[in-house]
Swiss-Prot record:
It comes from Rhopalurus junceus (Caribbean blue scorpion). Disulfide bonds join C11-C63, C15-C37, C22-C44, C26-C46. CDD domains: neurotoxins_LC_scorpion (cd23106). It is found in: Secreted. This is Putative beta-neurotoxin RjAa7. SUPFAM superfamilies: Scorpion toxin-like (SSF57095). The keyword tRNA processing does not apply. One of its GO terms (molecular function) is toxin activity. GO terms for biological process: defense response. Expressed by the venom gland. Beta toxins bind voltage-independently at site-4 of sodium channels (Nav) and shift the voltage of activation toward more negative potentials thereby affecting sodium channel activation and promoting spontaneous and repetitive firing. InterPro entries: LCN-type_CS_alpha_beta_dom (IPR044062), Scorpion_toxin-like (IPR003614), Scorpion_toxin-like_sf (IPR036574), Scorpion_toxinL (IPR018218), Scorpion_toxinL/defensin (IPR002061). GO terms for cellular component: extracellular region.
Amino acid sequence: KEGYPVGRDGCKISCVINNNFCKVECQAKWRQSDGYCYFWGLSCYCTNLPDDAQVWDSSTNKCGG
């Protein structure tokens, strides 16, 4: 599984071009995962996630309220 990790505010975790920052963010939630900064979305993106990992979903988006 893969997807955008969600911050405490329910939003995607923002980044600019810092892949290491995103890798740390992903591994803090899911130890075996990897991550990078998705340039077009300016958000961290995690890969190699467990099936039950909760990631950002446009249909359940709670960002900003």
